[in-house]
């Protein structure tokens, strides 16, 4: 069996097109365009690239985009004051603080300061709590994007054994909640898990988000399973690889996401989708 590719790039492009169309309709109806504020602290090269992509995405769909590029020594109090101002700004529907932050800043405190209805990353405890209570409002972007990718395969998730490799607050934990909502029986593995191979080999669906290249061996993948690889790791030769041993896994899986071009584009598209949702359903 050779797996079919889940083309995140194409699915994300289609989603951006739909969002741009809706923004055009809003303009024609005399409604304001959605607004996204992006806060970048310091000069981390990867963060600068991510933020540049997000601004380009906003431009493409016609959003108002406000950029706050702040020096690395910016204080916690100054950042909190900026977030407060953006919370009160009626032109802004979403506030994004680019992670990671410099060591002297408390990311949890800053993310919790964002009003839940402007938390378009979906990281606020209120939004995670709503997802856990089966009443999602603004959903974490990567898990939300993965659910869209899974829907594109036409696979029926009800009753599937799903394994999430990695238990981060950004992907693993909310991913487990999304899969529960989708009708899966979910196992979350983490650094204390014994015999990872055994868990993975029994899974109908594997979502890997550990940040370790080649952690999940291709031979562990059950024949016909769906494989979603969230990992993006740069090798010494400059190549980008995922957390799954792709070549072998692709011979066993029914569907698999490539790296790059799988999950990453959907995360960005879902940030736009959340911002549009906030504008239309939470702020208009």
UniProtKB/Swiss-Prot annotation:
One Gene Ontology MF term: methylenetetrahydrofolate dehydrogenase (NADP+) activity
Residues annotated to bind NADP(+): 166-168, 232
Q: Which Pfam families match?
A: THF_DHG_CYH (PF00763), THF_DHG_CYH_C (PF02882)
UniProt KW keywords: Amino-acid biosynthesis, Histidine biosynthesis, Hydrolase, Methionine biosynthesis, Multifunctional enzyme, NADP, One-carbon metabolism, Oxidoreductase, Purine biosynthesis
Give the source's domain of life in one word: Bacteria
Keyword Amino-acid biosynthesis carried by entry? yes
Q: Which reaction does it catalyse?
A: (6R)-5,10-methylene-5,6,7,8-tetrahydrofolate + NADP(+) = (6R)-5,10-methenyltetrahydrofolate + NADPH; (6R)-5,10-methenyltetrahydrofolate + H2O = (6R)-10-formyltetrahydrofolate + H(+)
Which Cys pairs does UniProt list as disulfide-bonded?
none
CDD domains tied to this protein: NAD_bind_m-THF_DH_Cyclohyd
The biological process GO terms on file are: L-histidine biosynthetic process; methionine biosynthetic process; purine nucleotide biosynthetic process; tetrahydrofolate interconversion
Gene Ontology terms, cellular component aspect? Answer: cytosol
Enzyme Commission (EC) number: 1.5.1.5, 3.5.4.9
Pathway where this protein functions = One-carbon metabolism; tetrahydrofolate interconversion
InterPro entries with a match to the protein in the record: Aminoacid_DH-like_N_sf (IPR046346), NAD(P)-bd_dom_sf (IPR036291), THF_DH/CycHdrlase (IPR000672), THF_DH/CycHdrlase_cat_dom (IPR020630), THF_DH/CycHdrlase_CS (IPR020867), THF_DH/CycHdrlase_NAD-bd_dom (IPR020631)
Q: Does the keyword 4Fe-4S apply?
A: no
HAMAP family given in the database record? THF_DHG_CYH (MF_01576)
Which family does the entry's similarity section mention?
A: Belongs to the tetrahydrofolate dehydrogenase/cyclohydrolase family.
Q: Tell me how this protein assembles.
A: Homodimer.
Known role: Catalyzes the oxidation of 5,10-methylenetetrahydrofolate to 5,10-methenyltetrahydrofolate and then the hydrolysis of 5,10-methenyltetrahydrofolate to 10-formyltetrahydrofolate.
Q: What is this protein called?
A: Bifunctional protein FolD
Annotated source species: Pseudomonas aeruginosa (strain ATCC 15692 / DSM 22644 / CIP 104116 / JCM 14847 / LMG 12228 / 1C / PRS 101 / PAO1)
Q: What gene, per UniProt, encodes this protein?
A: folD
């Amino acid at each position: 069996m050779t797996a079919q590719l889940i083309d995140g790039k194409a699915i994300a492009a289609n989603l951006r097109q739909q969002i741009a169309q809706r923004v055009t309709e809003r303009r024609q109806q005399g409604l304001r365009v959605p607004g996204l504020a992006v806060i970048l602290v310091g000069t981390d090269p990867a963060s600068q690239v991510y933020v540049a992509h997000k601004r380009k995405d906003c431009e493409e769909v016609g959003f108002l985009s406000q950029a706050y590029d702040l020096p690395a020594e910016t204080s916690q109090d100054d950042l909190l004051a900026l977030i407060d101002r953006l919370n009160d700004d009626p032109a802004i529907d979403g506030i994004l603080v680019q992670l990671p932050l410099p060591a002297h800043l408390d990311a949890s405190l800053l993310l919790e300061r964002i009003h839940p209805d402007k938390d378009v990353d979906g990281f606020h405890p209120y939004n995670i709590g709503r997802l856990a209570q089966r009443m999602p409002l603004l959903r974490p972007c990567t898990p939300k994007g993965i659910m869209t990718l899974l829907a594109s395969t036409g696979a029926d998730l009800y009753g599937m054994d799903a394994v999430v490799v990695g238990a981060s607050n950004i992907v693993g934990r909310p991913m487990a909640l999304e899969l529960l909502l989708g009708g899966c029986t979910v196992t979350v593995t983490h650094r204390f898990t014994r015999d990872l191979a055994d868990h993975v080999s029994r899974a109908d669906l594997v979502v890997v988000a550990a940040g370790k290249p080649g952690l999940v061996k291709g031979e562990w993948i059950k024949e016909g399973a769906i494989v979603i690889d969230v990992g993006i790791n740069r090798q010494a030769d400059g190549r980008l690889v995922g957390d799954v041993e792709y070549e072998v896994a692709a011979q066993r899986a029914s569907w698999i996401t490539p790296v790059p071009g799988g999950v990453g584009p959907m995360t960005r598209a879902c940030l736009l989708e959340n911002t549009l949702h906030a504008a239309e359903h939470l702020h208009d």
